[in-house]
Structure formats: C-alpha cells, structure tokens
Amino acid sequence: MAKDIKFSADARESMVRGVDILADTVKVTLGPKGRNVVLEKAFGSPLITNDGVTIAKEIELEDHFENMGAKLVSEVASKTNDIAGDGTTTATVLTQAIVREGLKNVTAGANPIGIRRGIEAATTTAVEALKAVAQPVSGKEAIAQVAAVSSRSEKVGDYISEAMERVGNDGVITIEESRGMETELEVVEGMQFDRGYLSQYMVTDNEKMVADLENPFILITDKKISNIQDILPLLEEVLKTSRPLLIIADDVDGEALPTLVLNKIRGTFNVVAVKAPGFGDRRKAMLEDIAVLTGGTVITEDLGLELKDATMAALGQAAKVTVDKDNTVIVEGAGSSEAIANRVNLIKSQLETTTSEFDREKLQERLAKLAGGVAVIKVGAATETELKEMKLRIEDALNATRAAVEEGIVAGGGTALINVMDKVAALELDGDAATGRNIVLRALEEPVRQIAYNAGYEGSVIIDKLKNSAAGVGFNAATGEWVDMIATGIIDPVKVTRSALQNAASVAGLILTTEAVVATKPEPAAPAMPQGMDPGMMGGF
C-alpha cells in the first residue's frame, strides 16, 4: 500500500492542526462553567458529556496526518485517565499549549532537542514543587469535598465518601445503572464470591431461599468430596460443638451430597456446601485468601494435606456466613489482622508488576474482598442520556477521590500550577533549554486562562491578579470571587495535576522533535457504474 510522507515543518504543522482540532473540542468542558459536547452514536440516543477522555476517543479526522496529531493528544488523555482517573481535559489543554509555543520557536530556528530537554527539566521541577505543597486527605468530610468538586454534585460526594468509609480505600466501589430515578448506595460487607449452595435443601430461610450460618466453622479445600468417609471424622468433631459448617470444595457429589442434605433435613446439624470460586491458579489464590481471612488452612495436595487427616485446627471461622443460590458472603472472618495485612501487601506487589488488564482487575477484586467489602453506587436519572452523563461524572469523581487519598491535594482551578511557576522560573538553564523552560511557564497559565474564558472572564486579567495573590488564593469561576481555594473546597488531587503535566510534556516533546510523518495514501474512489446498465447483465455471458 502506497504511503504519503511529509518532512520537517510541513510534517509538524499537519500534526498540530489535528492537535488543535481535538484540543479545541475538549477544552470547552474545563472548569465549573464548562460546556457540554454532544457525541453522535451509531445506535441509540446521542451522548451529552463533559468528560475529556470520552470526547477525545470519539474524534477521528479524515486527513491522516491531522488524525495522527489528534490521536497523540487522545493518548495523553487516556494515559492520564489510566493513571489518575481524571484531569484529562487539563492534560489536553497543557499539551496544546506546549505544542503551540514550541512550534513557534522551532519554526523560528530553535533546536527541538534542546527545547525538549528544557521542557523535561521544567516539568520535573513543577512536579516536585506540587508534591511539596500537597496536603493529605483524611476524614469523611474531606473525601466528600474532593468527590463533590469532581462530580459537581454534593450528593455524589456524600455517596462516594460514605462508600469509601464503609469498604476502605482499597475496597471495590462499582457504578451501576439503577432501575429507578434516584441514585443510591448499596454496600456488601465482608468477602463475597459468586458461588451458591449446591442444594436448595440446605437453606435456613425457605421464604428468602438463603442459608444463614451464625458463627460457623469453614472447611476449605480444592479437592472434590465424593465419599462421605473422607470428612466423617471432621464432621463428628464439628457436631460435638453444635455449630454450623460451611464446606468450600471443588465439588461435592456422589454419596457425600445426599448424606449432608439428609443430615441437614433431619436437623442433625446445619451444613452448607458451595463450590470453590474461580478456576485454575486463580482458584487456588482465592481459596488461600479465604483461608487467611477466616484463620483456616486450605486442604490441598500442594501442601501434602489429606481430607481424612484434617483436624479442627484446619477449619476457618467467621461471625456470619450468608449463602443464596448465586453468592456466598463471609462476614468478620477470624483470621489475624497481621496475616490479612501480609496477604494484602502481597496482592498489592502483584498489582504493581502485572501487565495484564484482566489480571489487574481480578487482583483488585481480591484486594477489595480482603480489605473490607464491595460498595455499589446505583445511578438513577430521568432519561438514558442523563444517566450516561451522570455515570461518567461519578466514575471521574471516584477516580479523583482515590487519587487524592493516595497523594494528597493542592489548590484547584489551575491555581496550584500558577503557584509553582516561581520554582520553574528559578531553574537555571541556557540556550534552547531555557526556551523549553519558558514554554512550560507559558503552558502552566493555560488551564486558568481556559477556565476563566469558559466562565465568561478575561483570562489574562485573572492570571495577572493570581500571580500577585498569596499562595493558595485563587479565582472561583463559579461565583466570580477570589477565595482561599482549599478552605473553600476547590481542590485538585496532586496525582491528577502532576499526571496531566507529565503526560502533556512527554507527548508534546515527541511532536516537536518529529522530523518525518508517514501516513497511508488514501485509496482512489471506485469508478461509478455507467448509468442505465442493468446490474443483472454483468457476467451474464
């Protein structure tokens, strides 16, 4: 397939046109007075959103060279979203500003490599300065404030802070669509896995069809139990305690299942059997998680353990277990807090090294189940369009809140970027590297300029006043007032701000040092069929 190639200034200018088209579309959404963008969908109603990364992903340009520029900025938004979960519009605005200023200087004869070196040095200095002024986030009220700023809704802020309080910072918080019009929070405390009872005769509540076990022992094994004799000694020991038993095994079949059911129906003792969750190596890991949580031991050949030799010491315990036809929930396992903390740290280290998105998701689920539970925010709205938009806002708010808890917060509304300009300006560089530093200094103003513009104010006037104000004092674009940003609750997670700047500088530097661009040549349009010819005649000879 033939290729089109452009060089030097021609190549860069083509890409920058794409950068500008995408950035101009996205940046109208920045700030409390940001506008919405309507996205056409192939099926269903259009999506109305102010989420930067969602808009960026939808943009596809006809010109191949311009499209490459747009896709690079879209990558900045996606990368920032992956790392910090928010700040995608800020990242896009910063990228455009660095590229635009950089291109002017490269066109005027500056060395792009020197400029890039200056951009990198200035970005590193700005990030260090941001981290130095970051304030930690703790407490339900502070968390609610961060979430409310990101979602533009105090109610959503309250839901997220309550969810994080209930399941912990490492807990899983999922966002689902509600069947009603109201948004609500539902929390499943304890460890839940998607396996239900093996027989409906094991239920303790025939109306709700659930089995509730109070203070049960828990047998955990990766073996199949077919012969009741394998576990008979253990059952006799449990029977003496008059406490219920939960069996988690690869399967329970053969004579074992009807024998257990018969004893349950007769009231000999309360027992429920469920299949082990997961498959393969993941099943082994999840069984070990359950064992750590409940203070038990996994009966497995990997450890040289046999069911017939198992003692009461191998059984786990919990305050309560609830089993329905689809799920099992273990509440307040009896495992030691030290063992659980060690297991959590092991999973966290695996999270840091994994490259698979699927593995990452499963590890996060395991981490949450060990850490405390799962919270579900069920989003309700009057229309499908409003529901989609609300769901995106809540996802952004949740990600921003997690980022804030992780690395702290700085003054919002672009104020923190203006406040670190003095540190960047003090960076001693010369030649083209100094030009790169100055490009970053100009770019640091751009988020404030755009927020002010979207709210109907003159950006340059706001920036001048901001530079002469005390650190932390900024412009509240929602009210038009000058306030202490953090005290007023106008805040940004430092992880979001620094990720936006780092990713913007990285991609902008690549665009400025581009000397050639290779794109696929458009295919010539197929010739139209001559008018009046009957398609059925073709090939009819």
Curated annotation (Swiss-Prot):
ATP binds at residues 29-32, 86-90, 413, 476-478, 492. The keyword Isomerase applies. Keywords: ATP-binding, Chaperone, Cytoplasm, Isomerase, Nucleotide-binding. GO terms for cellular component: cytoplasm. It is found in: Cytoplasm. Its EC number is 5.6.1.7. InterPro entries: Chaperonin_Cpn60_CS (IPR018370), Cpn60/GroEL (IPR001844), Cpn60/GroEL/TCP-1 (IPR002423), GroEL-like_apical_dom_sf (IPR027409), GROEL-like_equatorial_sf (IPR027413), TCP-1-like_intermed_sf (IPR027410). One of its GO terms (molecular function) is unfolded protein binding. It catalyses: ATP + H2O + a folded polypeptide = ADP + phosphate + an unfolded polypeptide. Pfam families: Cpn60_TCP1. PANTHER family: 60 KDA HEAT SHOCK PROTEIN, MITOCHONDRIAL (PTHR45633). Forms a cylinder of 14 subunits composed of two heptameric rings stacked back-to-back. Interacts with the co-chaperonin GroES. Together with its co-chaperonin GroES, plays an essential role in assisting protein folding. The GroEL-GroES system forms a nano-cage that allows encapsulation of the non-native substrate proteins and provides a physical environment optimized to promote and accelerate protein folding. Belongs to the chaperonin (HSP60) family. This is Chaperonin GroEL.
